[in-house]
A protein has these predicted regions:
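Surface-exposed patches in mature extracellular/periplasmic domains of secreted proteins
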Residues: 1-7, 105-114, 172-182
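A sensor for short, sequence-defined functional sites
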Residues: 1, 11, 36-40, 109, ...
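Juxtacatalytic substrate-recognition/specificity segment
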Residues: 1-86
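Acidic/His/Gly-enriched intrinsically disordered linker/tail segments
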Residues: 68-158, 189-193
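Amphipathic alpha-helical substructures
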Residues: 140-201
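Generic recognition of stable, solvent-exposed alpha-helical segments in well-folded globular domains
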Residues: 46-58, 85-96, 112, 116, ...
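Generic, well-ordered alpha-helical scaffold segments in large soluble proteins
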Residues: 53-54, 58-62, 66, 96-104, ...
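A glycine-rich phosphate-binding loop feature that marks nucleotide/adenosyl-phosphate handling sites
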Residues: 9-13, 116-120, 182-184
Length: 201
């Protein structure tokens, strides 16, 4: 989808006092690069796992929201943010695609993929005491009562992505997948043609 892409990593010393009080690791995607702030560790397998999980997820944001997004994302106001009802799509479906691509590449087995998705079921149930529509959570995620459920966007969003993918494959005899649907929507809307937030889901 892109002719070049740069991964920028910064590994922080876990002994830093500010990070011990409040661990704040993460990553941010851009059209042709992504930047990572991850804990430094001598555990090679742990480091590989963190990098693989995070880098694949951030790279796959080139699908959503970088190339398919609503007006709220296209014209994002950092001073007075208005969130999109599709945050679950941008983060959750991207998370599903990252798990799926790691399974398809052989980096994880089918059993490991099932375990990963099962953990997302338990994770979303743990974080969400009462049922909330994903569009409602996404739109209101900056409000205090919704902030504590932010992780659900990734966990349950990934489960919804898998559900949509399996349903599309079943109903169309494998002719349409979630990825092919997103590619079709990207042709219709695309990075410079954002959709109305209320029309997609």
């Amino acid at each position: 989808p892109v002719d070049h892409y740069t991964f920028i990593f910064f590994f922080a010393d876990m002994a830093r006092r500010d990070l011990q009080r409040r661990p704040a690791y993460g990553a941010l995607e851009h059209n042709y690069s992504s930047v990572y702030f991850l804990p430094e560790t001598t555990e090679e397998s742990m480091l590989k796992s963190w990098i693989a999980q995070t880098a694949v997820h951030e790279f796959l944001h080139i699908l959503v929201p970088l190339n398919l997004h609503s007006k709220e994302i296209a014209q994002f106001d950092f001073r007075e943010p208005k969130m999109s009802r599709h945050l679950w799509l941008y983060e959750g479906v991207t998370e599903y695609f990252s798990v799926l691509s790691r399974a398809q590449s052989g980096e994880m087995t089918e059993k490991q993929m099932r375990q990963t998705m099962r953990q997302k079921i338990f994770g979303s149930q743990f974080m969400m005491a009462k049922p909330v529509a994903m569009t409602e959570l996404s739109k209101n995620v900056l409000l205090p009562e919704y902030q504590k459920m932010y992780g659900v966007v990734y966990e349950k969003g990934a489960l919804l992505g898998m559900y949509f993918d399996l349903t599309l494959r079943e109903k169309t005899g494998g002719k349409i997948t979630l990825l092919s649907l997103i590619r079709t929507l990207t042709k219709k809307f695309g990075p410079d043609r954002p959709f109305e937030d209320t029309i997609l889901f």
